[in-house]
């Protein structure tokens, strides 16, 4: 991106922002209390929340994009007269902060302070192997993945902290987890305040037991959930050290911090008899090769199964007597997950090498092939999955590459004893349609990248990167039973169907290798712990009812919710390590981060009355309530309408004040988040609200808006590549309003949005230009036109303002902010620029200032600082934060259409004039350039020519019969071609149909009308001065096409005028300026028949750009046209022996004799070959 030339404009915006933020702070504009609002709620309230961000670093542009949706919504709803609350908390619960602090502590213990680290050895490059490592991230592990994301490229925590710009002295403090809670939350608030958020900061808090009020609130929530039988105790998957005999949490790990369990679908591939000789001793037993897959939805396309010939495998007996074949490592994991009779014991019945089961025949679930075979793949690794891999060449680049190797290389088949019939008949089966890659995505991408074999590891990794994520988010199923459904919606359903049928099992292993401090490689084990029973039927049913009434703004979000409710089961809500609130009935457990963050929006409603504005809840409570007084019964009374008044020392009126706040603000009117939180946090949010208020559906969430991820300059944000911006960096670079404008423009849907730096820079220029224009208008108030605002362009501009208000209102209401920015700023500014250009009589004062006021209000949710500043420039006494949405007056659509017509005609005429001036093709171009025409006749048609009239009638008939759509061109061409009256015109007919179809898209059904809704001749005549000036012509006349020659009559149609340019002949005379030292010169000018002073002065102004004002020029003729021009002018006597030419005088030209005379008051006067012009 090109370097900026300077920062004056962005500095100007930042200076305004600082002043305005100070003003808001002083006036406490965003602080709201239910007690003072209840009397004035005729237009309702609006309570919006954003998932509190995790406090292990600075906020970045991705956070800002999501929260900007809340911010814009609040800005709009304030203008609509609602009482708005936007609170903002900060999340500290969970493992990452504690793990980072403990890691720092360990580094200091091992390497000193500051640490002297050993040279980092080159880490072994991880080979891309057939283990499906390009996987869809498990969003439920969002907090852990954040820890990984913060790690950057440094191996050591100390290095990571250094990369944040911290000194050695400061870093040491971060070895205590509490310091993180003191350091990052104030920075987050500082950055968000710079953004200009409309937040009531009194209600902010941090989570964990550091804040005794929040701690008490979460304990109350969990006691209530347990009381209602929503929390159970039982076995859950966790990282476990067999050597230590206990779960291995982050602080117990030598390597693998932040790593959690990875869920696979374990596919059972039944070995068919006759068994391979190595397995013959197991005759009578059910033997299965078990393959671990992350992509159960692809299994409809299995063609074979892979094993590595030189890898060791075992067969072990499962709890029900079946034999599973896999690696020893996978069997060890399975033995801790209930697969074997005794926990942790693998009863091995057979040891074998992969090559000993090659060629075995299998029965595989879901695939259309009745029998598939075990084939060799040389790149399988032992440290991931089971060592057995099922092959889906339609959707896996590794599989199609390996299958092609075997098909192409007879010698390879012979080496491993593979018969042709085990390989050659098996072709990829279409399972999933992926936009851009078709229904055999792996085949397509391998051909595109020219992948030659399974050893092209780098290209195969690139291929998987390209199709796996796209396949998950955009892939559409093609198989029966799931046809037309999105992959992400059916993935879990397919997995469940297979498990229920006994064809698959859930299998877990660590995402990456985890080594305990005792140097034991960890497994995933089923361990006892507390969990929320989300799958429970009645709870799920009630949550589905909540979802039915939830506004999701787009169908994809609703489908994602529905799919999640379909598969969501128990969720472990307790941990033994990290920060957070302890389970009230079992203090050894901490409540984990996705479980203490489901109904905290209720805490926002009362936080300011408890905490005294202190994030940690350590200040004196405004109501004098101590944390320990907030018992379960007290919380019940505050949040449950029917709960009795508790035994407490707190005065009733104080608890009633808390209750009033909750009752006033609840439910949450809008929650905004990234779409990746739908399958976890947002679904838990619905579940928990239903559980806590089962009989009060009026307390359930009202709306959830999910957005896509944010790209930066069309690329993924990444610290390692440097394509990354923190919130504070973005504000420094673009100002708050400049950044907000670009965020609004980044995107509205659940697809990925794009923050473009060039757009942000262009936005800064637009905002600066806008405020400068407002200043200019305020300064020139007196010189603007007054009186009735009733010219054609006045009326058009007024209608366009009103239409803009209505469209922008609709876009804001639907949370389509990119569209609201388009209709409420870009199109609004374009309407003003058009008015300024068209209003040849000058802009009307009343309209200009109505425009400024309306524009400021429409833009205020996006750019509040600048709009507050402009509001002040307009002399408004109150803050724009207390203003109301503008009232739209009547909209004359016909008038707007007629103005659009005028702009199109002007554009067409300019193009035609340009083409007229260009030498004809094929002719020599060394001739003089063509002389510019002086006159133009525009022909307008009252009706369509007969052939067009007939064509339009046919199109309208089809449009109305075909559900307001036009059929294919073949259908239209067939009917029109059979009509005798059109035979002569068929060359013109289909291009005319194409033009109508194109305009139908742009302008709607009115394009099919046989007559225009306005008088186009009248529109052109009202704007004749503008058209003449715009084309720099002398004169334009408008006539009906019926007055023109045949060709024009045949082709001219309503709304598409034709024209003829011409050069009106004239006689050249000298135009002399006798005034000394004024920069005006003498020139030759053409005088044409019928000219007057006005037309001659306008012609002069085109040649002499120094003349700005027509009224300042005066024309004079010599009393003696023959001798007068020969006399030397005398200084100060420029008027002597000359007569002023009246504005009513008409010039007459005799082309034959090349002479000019004036007709004035019926008297004819010769003027010779020279006249005088004076500029005053």
Curated annotation (Swiss-Prot):
The keyword Glycoprotein does not apply. It catalyses: tRNA(Leu) + L-leucine + ATP = L-leucyl-tRNA(Leu) + AMP + diphosphate; L-methionyl-tRNA(Leu) + H2O = tRNA(Leu) + L-methionine + H(+). Residues 115-142 are annotated as: Disordered. The structure of cytoplasmic leucine-tRNA ligase includes four main functional domains: the Rossmann-fold aminoacylation domain, the editing domain known as connective peptide 1 (CP1), the anticodon binding domain for tRNA recognition, and the vertebrate C-terminal (VC) domain for tRNA binding. This is Leucine--tRNA ligase, cytoplasmic. 5-fluoro-1,3-dihydro-1-hydroxy-1,2-benzoxaborole inhibits LARS1 by forming a covalent adduct with the 3' adenosine of tRNA(Leu) at the editing site, thus locking the enzyme in an inactive conformation. The modification Phosphoserine is found at residues 167, 720. GO terms for molecular function: aminoacyl-tRNA deacylase activity; ATP binding; leucine-tRNA ligase activity. It comes from Pongo abelii. CDD domains: Anticodon_Ia_Leu_AEc. ATP binds at residue 719. InterPro entries: aa-tRNA-synth_I_CS (IPR001412), aa-tRNA-synth_Ia (IPR002300), LARS1_ULD (IPR054509), Leu-tRNA-synth_Ia_arc/euk (IPR004493), M/V/L/I-tRNA-synth_anticd-bd (IPR013155), RBD_LARS1 (IPR055416), Rossmann-like_a/b/a_fold (IPR014729), tRNAsynth_Ia_anticodon-bd (IPR009080). Residues 127-139 have a biased composition (Basic and acidic residues).
């Amino acid at each position: 991106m090109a370097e900026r030339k300077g920062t004056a404009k962005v500095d100007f915006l930042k200076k305004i922002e600082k002043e305005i933020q100070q003003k808001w702070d002083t006036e406490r504009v965003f602080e709201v209390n239910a007690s003072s609002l209840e009397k004035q709620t005729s237009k309702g309230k609006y309570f919006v929340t954003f998932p509190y961000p995790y406090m292990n670093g600075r906020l970045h542009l991705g956070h800002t994009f999501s929260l900007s949706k809340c911010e814009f919504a609040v800005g709009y709803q304030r203008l609509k007269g609602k009482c708005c609350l936007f609170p903002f908390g900060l999340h500290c619960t969970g493992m990452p902060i504690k793990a980072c602090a403990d890691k720092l502590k360990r580094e200091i213990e091992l390497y000193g302070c500051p640490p002297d680290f050993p040279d980092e050895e080159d880490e072994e490059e991880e080979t891309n192997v057939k283990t499906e490592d390009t996987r869809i991230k498990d969003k439920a592990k969002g907090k852990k993945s954040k820890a990984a994301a913060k790690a950057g490229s440094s191996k050591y925590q100390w290095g990571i902290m250094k990369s944040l710009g911290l000194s050695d002295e400061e870093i040491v403090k971060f070895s205590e987890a509490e310091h993180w809670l003191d350091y990052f939350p104030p920075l987050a608030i500082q950055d968000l305040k710079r953004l200009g958020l409309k937040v009531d900061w009194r209600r902010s808090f941090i989570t964990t037991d550091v804040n005794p009020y929040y701690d008490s609130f979460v304990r109350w929530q969990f006691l209530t959930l347990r009381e209602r039988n929503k929390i159970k105790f039982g076995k859950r998957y966790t990282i476990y050290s067999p050597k230590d005999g206990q779960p291995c949490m982050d602080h117990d790990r030598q390597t693998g911090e932040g790593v959690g369990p990875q869920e696979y679908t374990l596919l059972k591939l039944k070995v068919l008899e006759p068994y391979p000789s190595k397995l013959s001793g197991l005759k009578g037993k059910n033997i299965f090769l078990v393959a671990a897959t992350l992509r159960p939805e692809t299994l409809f396309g299995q063609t074979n199964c892979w094993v590595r010939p030189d890898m060791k495998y075992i067969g072990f007996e499962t709890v029900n007597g079946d034999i599973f074949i896999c690696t020893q490592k996978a069997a060890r994991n399975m033995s801790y997950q209930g697969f074997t009779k005794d926990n942790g014991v693998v009863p091995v019945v057979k040891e074998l090498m992969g090559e000993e089961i090659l060629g075995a025949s299998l029965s595989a679930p879901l695939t259309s092939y009745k029998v598939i075979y075990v084939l060799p793949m040389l790149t399988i690794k032992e440290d991931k999955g089971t060592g057995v891999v099922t092959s889906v060449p339609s959707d896996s680049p590794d599989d199609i590459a390996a299958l092609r190797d075997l098909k192409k290389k007879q010698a390879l088949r012979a080496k491993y004893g593979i018969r042709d019939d085990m390989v050659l008949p098996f072709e990829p089966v279409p399972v999933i349609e992926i936009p851009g890659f078709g229904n055999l995505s792996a085949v397509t991408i391998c051909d595109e990248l020219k992948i030659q074999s399974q050893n092209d590891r780098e290209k195969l990794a690139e291929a998987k990167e390209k199709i796996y994520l796209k396949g998950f988010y955009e892939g559409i199923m093609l198989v029966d039973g799931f046809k037309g459904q999105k992959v992400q919606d059916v993935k879990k359903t397919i997995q469940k169907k297979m498990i229920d049928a006994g064809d698959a099992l859930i299998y877990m292993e660590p995402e990456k290798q985890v080594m305990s401090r005792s140097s034991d490689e960890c497994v995933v084990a089923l361990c006892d712990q507390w969990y929320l029973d989300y799958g429970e039927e009645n709870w799920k049913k009630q949550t589905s009812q909540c979802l039915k009434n939830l506004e999701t703004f787009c169908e994809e979000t609703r489908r994602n919710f529905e799919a999640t409710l379909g598969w969501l089961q128990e969720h472990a809500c307790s941990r033994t390590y990290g920060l957070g609130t302890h389970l009230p009935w079992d203090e050894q457990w901490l409540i984990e981060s996705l479980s203490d963050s489901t109904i905290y929006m209720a805490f926002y409603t009362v936080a300011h009355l408890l905490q005294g504005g202190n994030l940690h809840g350590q200040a004196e409570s405004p109501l004098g309530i101590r944390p320990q007084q907030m018992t379960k019964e007290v919380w019940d009374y505050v949040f449950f309408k029917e709960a009795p008044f508790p035994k407490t020392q707190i005065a009733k009126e104080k608890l009633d004040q808390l209750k009033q706040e909750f009752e006033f603000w609840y439910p949450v009117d809008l929650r905004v988040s990234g779409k990746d939180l739908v399958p976890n946090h947002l679904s838990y949010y619905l579940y928990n609200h239903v559980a806590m208020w089962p009989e009060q559906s009026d307390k359930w969430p009202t709306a959830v808006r999910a957005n896509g991820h944010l790209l930066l300059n069309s690329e993924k944000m990444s610290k390692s590549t440097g394509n990354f911006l923190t919130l504070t960096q973005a504000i420094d670079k673009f100002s708050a309003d400049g950044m907000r404008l670009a965020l609004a423009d980044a995107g509205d849907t659940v697809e990925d949005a794009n923050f473009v730096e060039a757009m942000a820079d262009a936005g800064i220029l637009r905002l600066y230009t806008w405020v400068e224009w407002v200043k200019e208008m305020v300064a020139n108030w007196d010189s603007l036109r007054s009186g009735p605002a009733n010219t054609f362009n006045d009326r058009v501009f007024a209608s366009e303002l009103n239409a803009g208000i209505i469209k922008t209102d609709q876009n804001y209401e639907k949370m389509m902010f990119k569209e609201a920015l388009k209709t409420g700023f870009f199109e609004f500014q374009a309407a003003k620029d058009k008015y300024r250009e068209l209003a040849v009589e000058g802009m009307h004062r009343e309209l200009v200032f109505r425009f400024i006021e309306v524009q400021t209000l429409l833009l205020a949710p996006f750019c509040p600082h600048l709009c507050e500043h402009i509001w002040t420039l307009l002399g408004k006494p109150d803050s724009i934060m207390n203003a109301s949405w503008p009232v739209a007056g009547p909209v004359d659509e016909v008038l707007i259409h007629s103005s659009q017509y005028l702009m199109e005609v002007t554009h067409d005429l300019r193009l035609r004039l340009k083409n007229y001036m260009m030498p004809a093709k094929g002719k020599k171009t060394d001739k003089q350039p063509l002389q510019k025409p002086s006159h133009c006749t525009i022909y307008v048609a009252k009706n369509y020519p007969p052939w067009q009239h007939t064509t339009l009638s046919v199109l309208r008939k089809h449009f109305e019969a075909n559900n307001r759509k036009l059929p294919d061109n073949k259908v239209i061409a067939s009917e029109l071609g059979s009509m005798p009256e059109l035979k002569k015109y068929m060359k013109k007919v289909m291009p005319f149909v194409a033009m109508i179809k194109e305009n139908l898209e742009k302008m709607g059904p009115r394009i099919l009308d046989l007559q225009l809704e306005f008088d186009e001749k009248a529109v052109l005549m009202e704007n004749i001065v503008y058209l003449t000036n715009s084309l720099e012509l002398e004169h334009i006349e408008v006539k009906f096409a019926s007055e023109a020659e045949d060709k024009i009559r045949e082709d001219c149609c309503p709304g598409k005028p034709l024209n003829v340019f011409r050069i009106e002949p004239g006689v050249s005379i000298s135009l002399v300026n006798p005034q000394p030292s004024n920069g005006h010169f003498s020139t030759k000018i053409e005088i044409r028949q019928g000219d007057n002073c006005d037309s001659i002065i306008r012609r002069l102004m085109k040649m002499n750009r120094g003349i700005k004002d027509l009224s300042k020029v005066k024309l004079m003729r010599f009393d003696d046209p023959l001798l007068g021009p020969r006399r030397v002018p005398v200084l100060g006597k420029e008027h002597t022996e000359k007569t002023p030419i009246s504005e009513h005088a008409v010039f007459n030209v005799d082309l034959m004799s090349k002479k000019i005379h004036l007709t004035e008051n019926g008297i004819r006067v010769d003027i010779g070959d020279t006249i005088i012009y004076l500029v005053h």
